[in-house]
Amino acid sequence: YLPMINALARAGHHVIYCNSRFRGTDSALLMEKVVQDLGAAIKDAKDRLGYAKVVLAGWSGGGSLSMFYQQQAQHPTVTASPSGDGPDLTTLGLIPADGIMLLAAHISRHGTLTEWLDASILDESDPTRRDPGLDLYNPDNPNQPPYSAEFLARYREAQIDRNRRITAWVKGKLAELRAAGRPDDEFGFVVHGTMADPRWLDPAVDPND
């Protein structure tokens, strides 16, 4: 559905549209397995189809994925996913791409999603419990755009703290399931407040230069 793919093909370039085993199911996604799938596509392009050079073109999250893939293909270090699942990338023999093209790429999933977290939420089980001084959408919050450097630093720190609280809870839940002999059980939960990046309200935070 990306216009760049059709445009490249119409211009005479050979294009392979790669998708992972997680298409449409990001809630179950393990990025290390996506790297494995991308590696299989590159290997197939070179070994079966006979292409001498393969250039990765990553759009949005595909950009950070492409860079992650290339780094692990050249200098493999990741032996498991953060949850302890997923393939050992050091054993896969990933083939480095011959070039990378980044299209509207963000820096990473974890970085982007953390920067979107509503830092004011204090209780994951009750998102109405908030720190009013961090609530971007509270008209009574004295911290309004343009934001001060001090407020932005405090807000970003609170976002990271919230991320770590959620992560600690998730790891604890996974440990509970493993201890109960049910490591493959699914346990869904909602992360509230995921549209609260100060740059959306204050253009000076991330100006388009």
Enumerate the language-model features and the residues they cover.
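Alpha/beta-hydrolase-fold enzymes
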Residues: 91-209
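Conserved alpha/beta-hydrolase
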Residues: 5-25
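Primarily recognizes the serine-hydrolase "nucleophile elbow" in alpha/beta-hydrolase
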Residues: 44-47, 52-125
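Noncatalytic linker/hinge segments flanking ATPase motor cores
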Residues: 30-33, 55-61, 140-152
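Catalytic nucleophile-loop/oxyanion-hole region of alpha/beta-hydrolase
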Residues: 21-55, 75
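Active-site glycine-rich loops that stabilize anionic/oxyanionic intermediates
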Residues: 1
